[in-house]
Amino acid sequence: MFDSSALNNALVRWAEKKNLAGVSAAIMSRDGLVYSFNYGWRDAACTLPVNNDTMFGIASMSKSLTALCACILASEGRLDLDAPVCDFLPSFSVAGQPPEAVTVRHLAMHTSGIPPMEPLEWSIAMNSTGRPENEWLTEMKRTAPNPMATIDEVIDYVAHCGYTTLGAPGEIMSYSNEGYAIL
């Protein structure tokens, strides 16, 4: 067994040094929860403490998990990374390219040719609840061409919005939130 108080103290020092509002950490084993640590607040008023059920947005960390899942499926023979995305999502395409040009690998490696876009920001703005109204939120709601509430609405936008691609699939790497939303 490890000294949980030493780990607790180290995590508190780290959270304070980083000026973090709230932190949750856990160690799991095959048998279940071995250790949990919660620090700080889950609301701006500092009235609700972080607990084991607090949900944190993991944002772009989900890209690593998505890529890992795709690689596991590929290693098990359940996913071909070089399969066209349109095999799974028939309405998907990238401007100026045949539908079968973009593969799962292209999306995973940020090489689909899709330029930086706003659909995920629109989706966050249109589908989040409880966010205080601010200039960014107002502008996102004003400019969103559709609610972006489903993957089909994101795909429809990517397929038909008339953007210029950065290059052919596989040519240029450009970080793509939309690519991972589709993946």
Region locations from a protein language model:
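Conserved hydrophobic/aromatic pocket- or pore-lining residues that grip, position, or stack substrates
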Residues: 31, 107, 183
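A common structural microfeature
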Residues: 22-24, 36, 55
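Beta-lactamase-like hydrolase cores
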Residues: 1-30, 132, 158, 166
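N-terminal cofactor/phosphate-binding cores enriched in small/glycine residues
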Residues: 24, 39-40, 79
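Hydrophobic mid-domain F-helix/FG-region of cytochrome P450s
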Residues: 178-182
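Residue-level signal for well-ordered, solvent-exposed loop/turn and beta-edge residues enriched
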Residues: 32-33, 78
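Amphipathic coiled-coil signal-relay and dimerization helices
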Residues: 33-39
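Active-site-proximal loop and beta-strand segments within enzyme catalytic domains
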Residues: 44-177
